[in-house]
């Protein structure tokens, strides 16, 4: 099987889409798949283009129309609600009329497009994986709040994108809260943000082992992102053993963190931070498992 992917993996602090691409590139050869640089006549997997992409969504649909034997697979990891854009939904919906299969990054992402008239009938949900050799509890501690609460609670947030939908309103309120309670709470923000933070340790974007170590040394992760299709930031903090709380409008983040780990107002978040913090029930998986699931779907689709 020859597989074409219209995106190249890169090293650095990027989102889950890059992690998924890298995992597929790393793993597919072991399953007798070949990632090729020219359009094949068998399988295509794609996402919305970036500057380094090898073919836009529309170009790959055009290729499919000219070569109907090609199996067109869409990985759906974006939407207009995520960043307040226009046109992203329409592009995916148009492509769904020609796709042979679609991989959604969360159930929320699937339901979002189904409610808008998604046309493809062969769909699956495959949640991103995580490198469990990197994102793991600090010193093997998997339940940091089982018996007692630390004297100073270390709060962390991490995002590689500084889009305002990532929750900067709550991060500014967190910053003010920590300023009022410096002997009870510390707040670290890792990544990019436009939030005005005075009492927060802001760390430039990290990735890989550096990010895993930095996350695991905290006590709780707060993620206020809205309408996030499948946030790897939530998966990574849970893998590090951190109780992770997300906004009620967090999109895919809610199904990862769990409905019992959500907040919809500042009062709710403050109450969470002053009570016993509980681990999430969500079980993360490796990128190997993710790639196995993708391969299984591709193989099944290619035989249809």
Question: What annotation goes with each model-predicted range?
Answer:
Residues 84-86, 130-151:
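Acidic anion/phosphate-binding donor-loop and adjacent secondary structure
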């Amino acid at each position: 099987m020859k597989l074409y992917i219209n995106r190249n993996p890169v090293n650095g602090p990027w989102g889950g889409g890059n992690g998924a691409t890298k995992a597929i590139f790393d793993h597919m050869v072991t399953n007798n798949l070949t990632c090729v640089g020219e359009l094949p006549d068998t399988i295509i997997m794609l996402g919305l283009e970036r500057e380094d992409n090898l073919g836009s969504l529309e170009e790959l649909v055009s290729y499919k129309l000219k070569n109907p034997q090609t199996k067109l697979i869409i990985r759906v990891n974006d939407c207009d609600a995520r960043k307040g854009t226009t046109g992203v939904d329409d592009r995916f919906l148009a492509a769904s009329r020609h796709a042979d299969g679609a991989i959604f990054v969360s159930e929320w992402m699937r339901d979002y497009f189904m409610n808008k008239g998604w046309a493809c009938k062969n769909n699956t949900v495959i949640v991103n994986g995580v490198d469990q050799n990197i994102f793991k509890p600090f010193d093997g501690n998997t339940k940091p709040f089982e018996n007692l609460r630390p004297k100073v609670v270390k709060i962390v947030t991490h995002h590689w994108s500084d889009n305002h939908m990532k929750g900067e309103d709550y991060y500014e309120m967190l910053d003010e809260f920590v300023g009022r309670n410096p002997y009870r709470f510390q707040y670290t923000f890792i990544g990019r943000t436009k939030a005005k933070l005075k009492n927060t340790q802001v760390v430039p974007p990290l990735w890989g082992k550096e990010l895993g170590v930095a996350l695991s040394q905290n006590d709780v992760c707060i993620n206020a992102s809205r309408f996030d299709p499948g946030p790897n930031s939530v998966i990574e903090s849970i893998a590090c053993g951190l109780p992770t709380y997300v906004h009620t409008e967090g999109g895919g983040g809610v199904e990862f963190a769990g409905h019992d780990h959500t907040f919809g107002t500042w009062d709710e978040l403050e109450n969470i931070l002053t009570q016993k913090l509980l681990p999430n029930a969500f079980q993360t998986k490796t990128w190997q498992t993710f790639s196995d699931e993708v391969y299984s779907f591709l193989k099944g689709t290619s035989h249809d």
